Amino acid sequence: MPGIKVREGDAFDEAYRRFKKQTDRNLVVTECRARRFFESKTEKHKKQKISAKKKILKRLYMLRRYESRL
């Protein structure tokens, strides 16, 4: 769980910015959104398949783009 120590003389904005960075790095907000509603195993599996397909297509696109430069 993210937490910061506010140093003496620190402005609120600086401390808040550091806290936001930590929460973003630890994926707290995204995990919270994902757990907000129940997701069955089939839905999770579908999402994983879709993301895997997107990754493959992205790699193919980058590979073809790289090959066209040669």
UniProtKB/Swiss-Prot annotation:
Pfam families: Ribosomal_S21
GO BP, sorted A to Z: translation
A cellular component annotation (GO) from this entry: ribonucleoprotein complex
Molecular function (Gene Ontology), one example: structural constituent of ribosome
The entry's keywords: Ribonucleoprotein, Ribosomal protein
Family annotation (InterPro entries): Ribosomal_bS21, Ribosomal_bS21_CS, Ribosomal_bS21_sf
Family: Belongs to the bacterial ribosomal protein bS21 family.
Protein name listed in UniProt: Small ribosomal subunit protein bS21
